[in-house]
């Protein structure tokens, strides 16, 4: 099935490309989402008229992503985690945790846009990539630190008064 892309589609093509895809992918995803249209002569002519409007829209999205990239690059996240002996983490730091921490800083990003090869399992500073647009990838510094160690032994223990026998 030949289609004209109306937007940049990851791993497929850019705005205006004529691509060949399997019929199911075209009918069930690209066409209903408005990401493509059938590649006929009439549609090619109509698309050329619409291309400037779509290109301006894509440029606006790219500019907004670049601005957000600068904001993310200036942000350093500090994520406190529970650790055991030898500073070994309980669990790991995932994209969901990083996304929630970014949301607390006022940057709302879908966790699927945060690119981690594997979950973070060590303390320290880690560079995490965030794909904001097909052309814009921001780098975020995530500092994983140990939570304040609050132990139960530090709390004063109150001894119970001995009970008096019942009469």
From Swiss-Prot:
An example Gene Ontology biological process: translation
PROSITE patterns xref list: RIBOSOMAL_L9
Protein origin, superkingdom: Bacteria
Keyword terms, alphabetized: Ribonucleoprotein, Ribosomal protein, RNA-binding, rRNA-binding
InterPro entries (UniProt xref): Ribosomal_bL9, Ribosomal_bL9/RNase_H1_N, Ribosomal_bL9_bac/chp, Ribosomal_bL9_C, Ribosomal_bL9_C_sf, Ribosomal_bL9_N, Ribosomal_bL9_N_sf
Matches recorded under Gene3D superfamilies: Ribosomal protein L9, C-terminal domain, Ribosomal protein L9, N-terminal domain
GO molecular function, one term: rRNA binding
GO cellular component: ribonucleoprotein complex; ribosome
Pfam families (UniProt xref): Ribosomal_L9_C, Ribosomal_L9_N
Bilayer-spanning residue ranges: none
Record's keyword annotation contains Ribosomal protein: yes
Protein task: Binds to the 23S rRNA.
Similarity comment: family membership: Belongs to the bacterial ribosomal protein bL9 family.
Full protein name: Large ribosomal subunit protein bL9
UniProt organism field: Nitratidesulfovibrio vulgaris (strain DSM 19637 / Miyazaki F)
């Amino acid at each position: 099935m030949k289609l004209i892309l109306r937007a940049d589609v990851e791993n497929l093509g850019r705005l205006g490309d004529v691509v060949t895809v399997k019929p199911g992918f075209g009918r069930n995803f690209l066409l209903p989402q408005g990401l493509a249209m059938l590649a006929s002569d009439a549609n090619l002519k109509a698309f050329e008229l619409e291309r400037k409007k779509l290109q301006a829209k894509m440029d606006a999205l790219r500019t907004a992503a670049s601005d957000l990239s600068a904001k993310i690059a200036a942000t350093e996240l500090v994520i406190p985690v529970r650790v055991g002996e030898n500073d070994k983490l309980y669990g790991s730091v995932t994209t969901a945790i990083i996304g929630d921490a970014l949301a607390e800083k006022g940057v709302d990003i879908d966790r699927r846009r945060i690119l981690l090869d594997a979950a973070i399992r060590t303390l320290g500073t880690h560079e995490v990539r965030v794909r904001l647009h097909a052309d814009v990838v921001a780098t975020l510094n995530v500092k994983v630190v140990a939570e304040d160690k609050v132990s139960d032994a530090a709390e004063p223990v109150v001894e119970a008064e001995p009970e008096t026998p019942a009469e």
